[in-house]
Every structure is written in structure tokens, then in C-alpha cells.
């Protein structure tokens, strides 16, 4: 979902990493939904991508479920 929203705004991964103040590597992990960002980065991500409350909830649920699944293995 993050990648799709970024692409709709025609932002590159490099541009997003600059806007969020994080490394490109960190942003790529967020973009690929491999990592849940820190709270401050998540706030900036919400602002930059204009995420709705519904999208935020969906993203956090998905990432939390992904995290729990990988801890089970």
C-alpha cells in the first residue's frame, strides 16, 4: 500500500527517504512492507502520502500481523 501511494504521487524512493529524514535502505524496507517505521517516521509518512485513517489502520494491522507471523517461525 505504501509503494502504491508513493507511486501515485510520482515520488521516488530516494525522494521519500529525503522527505522522511531516513536512509534509502530504511525507506526501501518500509516501501516493501518489511519494517514498521518508528512513530516519528510514520507521522511523516502519513503526512507526505496523505494517508487516510482507514489506510493507516490497515497498514498498521498488516505490519503487526507480518511481525507476529515472523516471530512464530
Predicted ranges, named:
Residues 14, 25-28, 54:
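Key DNA-contact positions within bacterial/archaeal DNA-binding proteins
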Residues 22-36:
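Recognition helix of helix-turn-helix/homeodomain-like DNA-binding domains
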Residues 1-19, 44, 71:
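Short basic helix-loop element that most often maps to the first helix and adjoining turn
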Residues 39-43, 48:
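Short, Lys/Arg-enriched C-terminal cap helix and immediately downstream tail that follows
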Residues 36, 40, 53-73:
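Short, charged recognition helix plus adjacent turn
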Residues 7, 32, 50-51:
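Residues in soluble alpha-helical coiled-coils and helical-bundle/repeat scaffolds
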Amino acid at each position: 500500500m505504501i509503494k502504491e501511494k508513493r507511486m501515485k504521487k510520482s515520488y521516488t524512493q530516494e525522494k521519500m527517504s529525503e522527505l522522511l529524514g531516513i536512509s534509502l535502505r530504511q525507506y526501501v524496507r518500509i516501501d516493501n512492507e518489511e519494517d514498521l517505521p518508528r512513530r516519528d517516521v510514520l507521522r511523516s509518512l502519513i503526512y507526505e502520502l496523505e494517508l487516510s485513517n482507514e489506510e493507516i489502520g490497515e497498514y498498521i494491522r498488516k505490519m503487526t500481523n507480518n511481525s507476529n507471523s515472523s516471530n512464530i517461525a
